[in-house]
């Protein structure tokens, strides 16, 4: 779905900008490489430009014009700190493209710090490495971190064709 948002306008939107891709997927790199200054970060993946905890980014504020963060926050125990850090490293007017699974029928995010083992997380969140199911209140968390929010909702047809 991120590719749908980035293309075809994504190259123009990111051209000439300094882009940070958090926990990058190689399939998405083609949408920004060659079109922008492009850096990657992940604390575990090999071959990254940076290795840092997304909740404490050791980069000067305002250092990036765009940040791509695709299906990362549902893995981060302190997602509020991560959102604040992503906002901090963006230049004024910068773009953060953040995707995550949201259960639109739920008003409130479901999370419980006591669900802290891979087995329990698999049972409660459907994945051993997820720490929550987001509800609609994620929009408030994003705004509280300082972002202006634009929700991209693919059409049912796009979901069928690209999911």
PLM feature spans:
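N-terminal juxtadomain amphipathic helix
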Residues: 1-16
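Class I SAM-dependent methyltransferase SAM/SAH-binding core
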Residues: 14-57
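An acidic- and aromatic-residue-enriched active-site/binding cleft used to recognize and process polar
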Residues: 43, 69, 101-103
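A short acidic, Gly/Pro-enriched loop at the edge of an enzyme's catalytic core
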Residues: 55-67
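Active-site micro-motifs of SAM-dependent methyltransferase domains
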Residues: 56, 74, 104
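A short SAM/SAH-binding and catalytic strip from SAM-dependent methyltransferases
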Residues: 66-77
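S-adenosyl-L-methionine-dependent methyltransferase catalytic module, highlighting the catalytic core
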Residues: 77-163
């Amino acid at each position: 779905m991120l590719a749908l948002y980035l293309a075809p306008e994504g190259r123009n939107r990111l051209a000439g900008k300094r882009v940070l891709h958090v926990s990058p997927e190689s399939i998405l790199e083609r949408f920004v490489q060659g079109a922008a200054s492009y850096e990657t970060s992940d604390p575990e993946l090999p071959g990254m430009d940076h290795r840092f905890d997304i909740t404490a980014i050791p980069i000067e504020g305002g250092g990036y014009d765009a940040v791509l963060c695709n299906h990362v926050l549902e893995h981060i125990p302190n997602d509020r700190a991560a959102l604040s850090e992503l906002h901090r490293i963006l230049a004024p007017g910068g773009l953060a493209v953040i995707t995550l699974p949201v259960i639109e029928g739920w008003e409130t995010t479901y999370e419980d710090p006591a669900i802290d083992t891979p087995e329990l997380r698999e049972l409660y969140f459907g994945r051993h490495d997820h720490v929550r199911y987001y509800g609609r209140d994620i929009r408030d968390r994003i705004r509280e971190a300082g972002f202006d929010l634009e929700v991209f909702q693919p059409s049912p047809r796009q979901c069928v064709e690209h999911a």
